[in-house]
């Protein structure tokens, strides 16, 4: 939270990403991440880790949705796979690393959750709930559309300008 020294939630996420050997999955309604988080996700994908991020296919806030999408291209160009959940708005905040460690809580992958708000999360390791989280991710991937390919190419100039402007305000969203 804002009254502590350090950014514990981001540190947990970064450590999980860095330690991943086989896969790292994340589900988050908002993807507005720091350069450090972007770099670690990309490095994990480049070293052969299956990195997948699920965001909503149906937005609750259109500006935040477009800002979230502005983070896709740099990630997918370096091997991260992006999915959008199609049945509705996905509000889960969970991660799964190598089928051994997971997080569940209120912490979004965004500036407000990671740096400004008081949030709660549970770090799980080697317990029965891990299997259930893995099954949940399998179901999520089944009903989500992978949008990785459409973000590998060039985006229109207008869209890039809009996304650059939105990113200026990202810490406020």
Regions found by a protein language model. Name each.
Residues 23-25, 30-173:
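PLD/PLD-like phosphodiesterase catalytic module centered on the HKD motif
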Residues 14-22:
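Secondary-structure "cap/kink" motif recognition
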Residues 1-12:
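Active-site cores of enzymes that catalyze phosphoryl transfer or operate on phosphate-rich substrates
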